[in-house]
Amino acid sequence: MSAKDVKFAADARERLIRGVDILANAVKVTLGPKGRNVLIEKSFGAPRITKDGVTVAKEIELEDKYENLGAQLLRQVASKTNDLAGDGTTTATVLAQAIVREGAKAVAASLNPLDLKRGIDLAVAEAIKDIEKRARKVQSSEEVAQVGTISANSDAAVGKIIATAVKKVGNDGVITVEEAKSLETELDVVEGLQFDRGYLSPYFVTNSDKLLVEFEEPYILIHESKLTSLQPLLPVLEAVVQTGRPLLVIAEDVEGEALATLVVNKLRGGLKVAAVKAPGFGDRRKAQLEDIAILTGGQTISQDLGIKLENVTLSQLGRARRIRIDKENTTVVGGTGKKKDIDARIAQIRAQIEETTSDYDREKLQERLAKLSGGVAVIRVGGATEVEVKEKKDRVDDALNATRAAIAEGIVPGGGVALLRAKAAVSKLTNPNPDIQAGIQIVLKALEAPIRQIADNAGVEGSIVVGKILENRSPTFGFDAQKEEYVDLIEAGIVDPAKVVRTALQDAASVAALIVTTEALVVELPKEKAALPAAGAGADF
């Protein structure tokens, strides 16, 4: 076991706070509409320029081990807020720094750190109640665009694209952000249910110019196992031929005699047919096939259910308005499944999302939910250079996360005003223990920190802005740092998601209170490098 170095009391806290300040000062310059960018050197490739707080925080590693402990703790604030709300990381960092600074002063004045923490916790709980009470539901596409615009650093085009994406795929739809090869930022929406399996043979293609299979009003055979022989398939093929409609076969695999027969039928023009592999593997494949069956009003042909392929009738096949298959993807549009069955399946997947502890499983379940309930949208971010595209993608990611948070828990006046207004509720708290009361006062002061920083970044005196807002009785009155004027924030479209504000305060207080109660630091001493052995004769040649 390697030797350790230990620091105590004031010396330990001073070093921790130095680390907190270094990280916080680098992050907080990005706050607000007039926040600046941070340029980050990368060990390989071009440097990265960003205005995203958590990206800056993750890049900071300090040489002094004690200071680095403080920076790492503050980085946790940004990371946790990003994980839970997806935005508000800079606000959380500014709040944490303010609580740490005031808390350290109180501890230096011989107040009890544990009582201070109790006071901080009481005040934060009261502030969160006030924020939740002020939140109002997002009611229009315009409000969704406003949230996106603010989080994307007042980029109205980004807000508009996100609002369009949400409108098209719904609240349960999946929206992803990718880098584009062009200069423009575009929105690509996939209607219906899409899975990543293409046609098994190019002979199935119906549109030879675009190499696509396109069917109108097809039947869909959903089979869980491999199809290799022709005999079990014949009754289904004969029944479908009588209707004159196309047939899509989805199975674990289609090969040998079965595939050859389907291809020959297609080429001779007797039956419009195509075959694709089932998506996923194992239990996940079973679940996805069941999703397709429910969406199309069909039945999964499975030995587990005792259904034999040779006994399948037309009523057990799924149906859809349209199907489009390319080399890599299959898209089913307008499935004819019953609404109550689809709603029941959606409710079941939602329950699984709530219960799962695995991030990977949650992501896959959300994809299935999106495919059943709305669709998938892809925002392709364009720009002139790689650096510009990456910077813009950071802002679009933030805006998208903020929009989801706003839909989940509603919106509050932005620009740090929701936190400032929460002071009124917190100031009513009283406690006979003076140290706990001091903890409440720490939070009261910290609640002003974000709005002061937004004003400072805009070149305006923060204390004047705070004073003017508190003088006005209107809960939506605030400071528009972009135009440097006082406005009704809701009318001006300057709003924040309540979830982002709440999470930022919770996470900031949680870590900051732990730093305040820290009394000793333990770090590993650097190991001395052994001297290299003397070079032998002739080593210079």
UniProtKB/Swiss-Prot annotation:
Coiled coil (residue ranges): none
Protein role: Together with its co-chaperonin GroES, plays an essential role in assisting protein folding. The GroEL-GroES system forms a nano-cage that allows encapsulation of the non-native substrate proteins and provides a physical environment optimized to promote and accelerate protein folding.
HAMAP family in UniProt: CH60
Quaternary structure (record): Forms a cylinder of 14 subunits composed of two heptameric rings stacked back-to-back. Interacts with the co-chaperonin GroES.
Subcellular location: Cytoplasm
Protein name stated in the entry: Chaperonin GroEL 2
Single annotated GO MF: isomerase activity
GO cellular component, one term: cytoplasm
Transmembrane segments: none
Annotated catalysed reactions: ATP + H2O + a folded polypeptide = ADP + phosphate + an unfolded polypeptide
CDD domains xrefs: GroEL
Taxonomic classification: Bacteria, Pseudomonadati, Pseudomonadota, Alphaproteobacteria, Hyphomicrobiales
Keyword terms: ATP-binding, Chaperone, Cytoplasm, Isomerase, Nucleotide-binding
Gene: groEL2
